[in-house]
Amino acid sequence: MSGPLRKHHPLLKVVNHSVIDLPVPSNISVMWNFGSLLGLCLVSQILTGLFLAMHYTADVNLAFSSVAHICRDVNYGWLLRNLHANGASFMFICLYMHIGRGLYYGSYFYRETWNIGVMLLVLTMATAFLGYVLPWGQMSFWGATVITNLFSAIPYLGPDLVQWLWGGFSVDNATLTRFFAFHFFLPFMIAGLSVVHLLFLHQTGANNPTGLAGDVDKVPFHAYFSYKDVVGFVVLLAGLVFIALFSPNLLTDPENYIPANPLVTPVHIQPEWYFLFAYAILRSIPNKLGGVVALAMSIVVLFFMPFVHSSRQTSHNFRPLAQVLFWLMVVNVLLLTWLGGQPVEYPYIFLGQAASVIYFVNILLLIPIVGYVENKLLFS
């Protein structure tokens, strides 16, 4: 058979159509780089996590010591641990940028791709939460206790569900063991779902900044965009290595360097920085069940994006009013992130409630209204 092997070999053909001869709109910007960066982060996390798991002990009496042993006694264990812990932060930065790009340029109209992407977000958040528990420091223990306790707000099933999650009547050895098992398994599930995400994306083709059909002007992914992605890889890895070597504790909580003690509650229980926006929404509602529903809705609301979009234009590029709402949402999420790290007292309680209301009103009410107004101004 004539032609390159990659074009007719059963396995190489799949790779060829996915990353080499893939037709891509010629006008996509650097904002389309974050998907490949997330793939790099996932590979990095799986590899560093695999080597850490070889030395970690999932036992409440030994977990904290085993992490200290990895950092002190294992060759380059400190580097593996720093890369893994900070790699999670970099992965969430890329993830939020990827979602932001999708919201700005209307990628949610590719519904299967978008819905699987939101599922990937939920799985990644679950994996990160489980990983935060494993070092068995103070914030690990109390974070696990507080977050798993939220399931008790579910009517009728709640208390039994919490005991089933714990494997007993409190967060203990059974909890840590199953959290480690799921933390090890979920990244492979994320990798599999990412392949499905790409499969659906390549069925429709990539979006582009204009929001218009890009079929008239497409170029092969390699070499036009593969080299562009490599630049992103270099920048991301340089940033990750810099943080891991020079300031590895910049994004971590000092409270987690104290071994878990069920008898001493930390002054301020909080998750890692990338969950603080959702945590602020949870805390803003005084009712437990209401807070859990609001927490879930802060992520689930992304599923509604194709339905609340009422404008005839896909992208925000040519929609000044919609751009104002988008940047209001960005600033609001940053404000919620800051508020999630503040103590539960005035004025942070009121500010958190106001920011939470703005978050949902913006997405569920203002976006459809502005789309309708723009249609009237432009097309009537």
From Swiss-Prot:
UniProt-annotated location(s): Mitochondrion inner membrane
Cofactor note as given: Binds 2 heme b groups non-covalently.
Residues binding heme b b562: H84, H183
Pfam families according to UniProt: Cytochrom_B_C (PF00032), Cytochrome_B (PF00033)
Coiled coil start-end: none
Keyword annotations of the record: Electron transport, Heme, Iron, Membrane, Metal-binding, Mitochondrion, Mitochondrion inner membrane, Respiratory chain, Transmembrane, Transmembrane helix, Transport, Ubiquinone
Function in brief: Component of the ubiquinol-cytochrome c reductase complex (complex III or cytochrome b-c1 complex) that is part of the mitochondrial respiratory chain. The b-c1 complex mediates electron transfer from ubiquinol to cytochrome c. Contributes to the generation of a proton gradient across the mitochondrial membrane that is then used for ATP synthesis.
Official protein name in the record: Cytochrome b
Source organism of this protein record: Branchiostoma floridae
